């Protein structure tokens, strides 16, 4: 394998023979020099011929590695973490096995990275043919590429899935950011909210060109109604502790970031019986700052006020 690896593409795989074939075919036609790209397919003990299909591309893709698991973990976190352990590229790019990228994607992304010197390059999403997965443009609203953005000044809080984002590996390594292996929903949120907290600047490619196409809806759709409040509060508290412990962030930056994330998580947390109180007990000293923060929305203000009024007390 070449020592000059620019990008590590990480693909978790489980029983997606057709999807992995299409994805790897599209990687074969990249305009970018694929000698500078490693592709890590991390299989979670597929029971179909997905792994065999992937091995057929070994001669076409010079730096293809296939990791095989002895047991099925039941999610994407374990396969992704195994791939992170061996990744060598300057950049990480996560792609789901049902999805694919267009031939100019890597070239455009690295060109933007070199120009901007940003820590993250985000690719706008497009729906693949026959996909019924919802498509939101709110996080990718510019037709042209925008660089040198601060997270607080974007709408990337509406894009908390890790796919389609080039992330500097040194940032993930420095801050020991991993995917959680003890929850089954919103693992991406756990990982990406921590990344968003510590990247200094971000580029978002314009949607005038096609980049990342996704196919199937996630096994558990990421909606407020089917994310268990106990998991939602677990994720938020983990991110809260991570952000609070970052010495390179100012206190104002920490509160800005925590407020933005709480806006997204309020409805999920307040829907539980015990989750609101667990959240309140853990974050109470900071809530008076959050409630006055410039980024807070009305729904979150009401939630915090009701917490202080005791309206979520399980004994009421």
Model-predicted regions and their roles:
Residues 5-8, 38, 190:
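Cell-envelope/extracellular polymer assembly enzymes that use nucleotide-activated donors
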Residues 69-87:
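Glycine-rich, basic loop-to-helix element that forms the pyrophosphate-binding segment
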Residues 16-30:
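Short, well-formed alpha-helical segments that are part of the catalytic scaffolds
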Residues 97-229, 246-248:
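Donor-binding/catalytic cores of nucleotide-activated saccharide
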Residues 26, 43-53, 71-73:
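A conserved acidic beta->alpha catalytic loop
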Residues 92:
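Short aromatic/hydrophobic "clamp" motif used to bind/position activated sugar donors
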Residues 35-45, 65-69, 97:
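Short beta-strand/loop segment that forms part of the nucleotide-sugar
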Residues 1, 36, 270-316:
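Membrane-interface aromatic/basic loop that binds lipid-linked glycans or pyrophosphate carriers
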